Amino acid sequence: MPWASGGFQFVKPPCRWDADRHRIYTMNESHRPSPKIDIVADGPYSVSGGLPLCEQWIVTNAEGESLEYREGKKYPVQPQYALCRCGQSGGKPFCDGTHETVQFDGTETASHQPYIDQAVTIEGATMLLTDQESLCAFARFCDPKGRIWNLVKETDRPEAQRLVKHEAGHCPAGRLVAWDRKTGQPLEPTFEPSLGLIEDTAKKVSGPIWVQGGVPVVSADGKAFEVRNRVTLCRCGRSTNKPFCDGTHAA
């Protein structure tokens, strides 16, 4: 059944491919709305623009260290859908209206200041690393091979350069960004606009929503957060830095 909140109405997505709805976009791509995520007050994430959605499983080594991502289940493409933010939906990852029953408090507490104004900088020989700790989603790609904060200081070595770029680029939250010291340019992975549902194999918990490719995230009050290549949104409902993940799901 559909539910209505704050002027929005959402319907639980069908369990099969909906060719007619998909065709709205494929017939005339020029009319396709730009991807966007609107936060509904004390409710879900309203996703528009036909953003692809799939599971992203963290792959670990024998020691449990995070190494790569493995793509899991892909969901049918839809023009608009609502993703659970309270963490208690019976139809995860989609919203089923449970937030109203449990009186979910989705108050946003995250700063709207630009990332670079909140991050600290660690200097290395050929690279820089910026770090905004409050964004940590506890994916732990920064830990292998001596930890990224130490590795960046060794970037006179090609292997250390490779590891820093890899580990920073795999940080789903964008807490960590590697920079070329000479050019001053960020060393960012290339993402198409899409959403990933992180699944943490080592911790056996579901992680945040991984927003990729510069998708705007707009507060319930209409104010947009800084558009970034990668951020993670809380989907357990318990983050103290809403709407962003703070790693509480793995605590």
Which role fits each region the language model picked out?
Residues 8-10, 25:
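Aromatic (phenylalanine/tyrosine) cluster motif
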Residues 18-25:
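Intrinsic-disorder-associated, low-complexity terminal segments enriched in Asp/Asn/His/Tyr and depleted
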Residues 45-47, 81-84, 93-95, 143, ...:
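Short, structured motif recognition centered on aromatic/hydrophobic residues
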Residues 92-103, 137-156, 166-183, 242-251:
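Iron-sulfur cluster-binding cysteine motifs and their immediate structural context
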Residues 33-54, 108-139, 207:
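Ferredoxin-type iron-sulfur electron-transfer modules and their immediate structural context
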Residues 26-51, 55-57, 188-205, 212-214:
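Short helix-coil boundary/hinge micro-motifs
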Residues 70-85, 117-138, 148-169, 184-187, ...:
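Ferredoxin-like iron-sulfur electron-transfer modules
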